[in-house]
């Protein structure tokens, strides 16, 4: 599975180029199933989840290839509408094949998804929305089986809870539905704005992306599109936190400051000097005093759950008491016991992590349990005394492109060990 061997005590300095956003690229890849033409994407990150998705598209009958950060897809010859357990089990995003397949082909069998073990992430929102649009859906034998005679029909949909994947799936399905669909209480994440812009680039008619009400005027078909995936705001935030807790100075290039308003505000509150340009962000912590901060995760534009683990590390080494409340996912403090093995002073009370006055972190062997937790353990290893080994790093490869190479360029002492 591989390990990272990290020598602690480094101060990160320099520039790092941010990759395309995994959480934008994945739904865009699935949305390419809606098109009868050629789709060319740029700024696609080189990640395990991306290659898994391309394999799934090929299994369905599409042409799909990646050359560096460019991806070409042609789904005109799709003949198979079943997403098998073999590919779906490692990646929850596979549920995003459901909407496009049933919208374009009237049929989809999607194995119930796997992926990060951080909570229920229910699929009932996807199912209920598609049923309101006319699909007949059964869940049996580990599959979601959806059928519709003719085209899906536009409908007025209300999301019982804010769901990024649910909003994305129904947006894609509605793009080829007959009539107008409105989605109320829609998720507002930037990655969904990217998805809507991509679908519109293929000829779709979606308005309201980035607000809580989407209006989708269905079209009969979608065609060619060339599109650049937006930068990864979570990778950006991760490197910024690493720079801050190491007492260094890090500049993230090819990123988008407007996507990180809540995170940048908390970094300033933590004592960092934050400077931004049109496509770059720099944090400077040299000769500055780190401070603990209180965090409460919530849907965009509030503080993102995907940055919670990284700020937990920040609070463990900052003076004072910092409280982190996780409101999005249950079971998303699996990094805490691993940080405690390194000496972190953290008390868990339900969905609240209370980080007390710091003791120095000491290197230890720790296990990555999910994507963002693994990033927090790498950050902790960079600032701990001595040597840290992070096991099960396949989690981090799902969402961070060549993270060790980027950290080494900033002065980190980190090595990948394959076993």
From Swiss-Prot:
| Function statement | Cell wall formation. Adds enolpyruvyl to UDP-N-acetylglucosamine.
Query: Which is an annotated Pfam family here?
Result: EPSP_synthase
Please state what class of enzyme this protein is.
Answer: transferase
Task: Look up the EC number in the record and give it.
Answer: 2.5.1.7
Query: Where found in the cell?
Result: Cytoplasm
Would you tell me the protein name for this molecule?
UDP-N-acetylglucosamine 1-carboxyvinyltransferase
Q: Which family does it belong to?
A: Belongs to the EPSP synthase family. MurA subfamily.
Q: Which UniProt keywords apply?
A: Cell cycle, Cell division, Cell shape, Cell wall biogenesis/degradation, Cytoplasm, Peptidoglycan synthesis, Pyruvate, Transferase
- What organism does this protein naturally occur in? Psychromonas ingrahamii (strain DSM 17664 / CCUG 51855 / 37)
Q: Which CDD domains match?
A: UdpNAET (cd01555)
One Gene Ontology term, aspect cellular component:
cytoplasm
Catalytic site residues?
A: 116 (proton donor)
What Gene Ontology terms for biological process does this UniProt record contain?
Answer: cell division; cell wall organization; peptidoglycan biosynthetic process; regulation of cell shape; UDP-N-acetylgalactosamine biosynthetic process
For the ligand (phosphoenolpyruvate), the binding residues are 22-23
